Amino acid sequence: MAETEALSKLREDFRMQNKSVFILGASGETGRVLLKEILEQGLFSKVTLIGRRKLTFDEEAYKNVNQEVVDFEKLDDYASAFQGHDVGFCCLGTTRVKAGAEGFVRVDRDYVLKSAELAKAGGCKHFNLLSSKGADKSSNFLYLQVKGEVEAKVEELKFDRYSVFRPGVLLCDRQESRPGEWLVRKFFGSLPESWASGYSVPVVTVVRAMLNNMVRPRDKQMELLENKAIHDLGKVHGSLKP
């Protein structure tokens, strides 16, 4: 109870600062849930989506969401889209199966890094990166290697605050079907929570951990949250809607 009350106070203090935020990857499952939670909590005075296409929303809550459509192959031409945001969330990502090896590297490393560079130049103070459990630039696995590489490259940009989230298998009802994901989610979803939490995590828990972490003051410039820390922080709901 004391923890949720403290979190509610932190949220209220954060709201009073009238900060602005951008989200990269709002069309994906994590980005979509993140946007929903941000709007429900009313944490920012301005919310901007940066993506390759404009998204359509029917709900009234989304009417004031700003959208910047960019060409990720020519991001330097869209530097203005990254200007004036206090906080940034990057949920960009694809798979090797969908985009091929070169396409995967281009999206998950090159697009992310260039976006971070433009955000830093545009005045962003706190950059949040959705990475992956096991990310390691020295890994022999391309997926984990690329995730580790971009983590390190973004850290070199020296944001005032840089938060990296490394969730395990994301449990969600993904709109876009990816080969094998349904079976994996079904497997982890059927396991006892105490065991599954080491290897998987619901998307909504990741999102809540991101936002709960954001409103808490930190002295460290860089912070890394592994799957267990994401579980623990994401379970503190405070005044969040169920």
UniProtKB/Swiss-Prot annotation:
Compartment list: Cytoplasm
Gene Ontology molecular function terms on file: NAD binding; oxidoreductase activity, acting on the aldehyde or oxo group of donors, NAD or NADP as acceptor
Gene Ontology cellular component annotations, sorted alphabetically: cytoplasm; nuclear envelope
Pfam families per record: NAD_binding_10 (PF13460)
Keyword NADP: yes
List of catalytic residues: 143 (proton acceptor), 147
InterPro entries named among the record's database cross-references: NAD(P)-bd_dom (IPR016040), NAD(P)-bd_dom_sf (IPR036291), Semialdehyde_DH_NAD-bd (IPR000534)
Function, as annotated: Represses translation by preventing reactivation of elongation factor eEF1A. May also inhibit nuclear import by competing with nuclear import substrates for binding to a subset of nuclear transport receptors. Has additionally been proposed to act as a redox sensor involved in cellular oxidative stress surveillance.
Subunit structure: Monomer. Forms homodimers during oxidative stress. Interacts (via N-terminus) with elongation factor EEF1A1 (via middle-region); the interaction is direct and competes with EEF1A1 binding to guanyl-nucleotide exchange factor EEF1B2, thereby inhibiting GDP for GTP exchange and reactivation of EEF1A1. Interacts with nuclear transport receptors XPO4, IPO5/RANBP5, IPO7, IPO9 and KPNB1 as well as GCN1L1/GCN1 and LRPPRC probably through their HEAT repeats. Binds NCOA5/CIA.
Descriptive protein name: Protein HTATIP2
Organism, scientific name: Pongo pygmaeus
